[in-house]
Amino acid sequence: MEQIPASIWTLTAGVVVTLISFWVGHHHGLLPEQASEQAPLVDNFFDIMLTIGTALFLVVQGAIILFVIRYRRRAGEEGDGLPVEGNLPLEAFWTAIPALIVIFLGIYSVDIFQRMGGLNPGDHAMHSMHAPKSGMAVVAQAPSKTTSDATALLAAAQPPEIGIGASPDVQGKAPDLVVDVAGMQYAWIFTYPDSGIVSGELHIPVGKDVQLNLSARDVIHSFWVPQFRLKQDAIPGVPTTRFKATKVGTYPVVCAELCGGYHGAMRTQVIVHTPEDFETWRRQNQAIATAPVIPSLRDRHIHEMGVTAELVAQVEAIAHDPSAEKL
């Protein structure tokens, strides 16, 4: 029986590894549903990394298993293996291939981040519209005669803020909705500057460009919505995050930065409405925000005692009536 050439076995193994790797990379089911425009970009990058990782795993583990079986010590063998040392072509190969893979993934990841708006210097002006400015930035915008040229140059050279900014299709445009997000131990507070609404949940319309101005009141927190593939630390210098939700629904908001003993309980939710439902929610909550009813300590105490409003009115009338009999 004619022996199959080693090249045929190598080619067959390469085809099998390639097919398995591509199948695993596109059918893994490891990620939650996609609910934002940024999610497909992140998922595509993850699929590529998983495909490459699967191929490397199969090649390395397959080679180990093959050599363990084929070159195992057999019965009656007492000698040692040949003292082989060094193989320049092989060493160059297994150094060059990982280096090329790392370079490719690094360049591609930067491209993905830029398409999401992360490293686009043109977004600095849009960030400055809503984000708090430092003293140096204020000096740069309103220079006085006493400001030296060196100080002005330093202010003008202030680097752009980084983070998840505006994607290229909305670059230079104002967001449809701005929300101030404050993280504190152990809650998220969402404030809508245009309406004065303050909420413990994030409400946004589907299909609209949303900008979050992130801040932390105590320690560092990290705003994470898995379905949006959106994770941004609330730290100085990275104040804004922009995204666009694509599916109506309710999704968890998680703090992904260890922030204290109850870090695991720092959760809330983002509710994505249709534009009509969002306007209804905003009108209802704006009325409450413009005329808040804050009960006094006395009112809360009376309510806890079960005293009716009529009885309170009678007591107050007697107390303010000079003709009433004093006990």
From Swiss-Prot:
Gene3D superfamilies, alphabetized: 1.10.287.90, Cupredoxins - blue copper proteins (2.60.40.420)
Cleavable signal peptide: 1-23
GO-annotated molecular function: copper ion binding; cytochrome-c oxidase activity
Transmembrane segments: 56-78, 96-114
Main location: membrane
Binding site for Cu cation: 221, 255, 259, 263
Co-factor requirement: Cu cation
Membrane topology per record: Multi-pass membrane protein
CC per GO annotation: plasma membrane
Compartments where located: Cell membrane
Protein name: Cytochrome c oxidase subunit 2
Species this chain originates from: Thermostichus vulcanus
Lineage, top ranks: Bacteria, Bacillati, Cyanobacteriota, Cyanophyceae, Thermostichales
Chain's gene name: ctaC
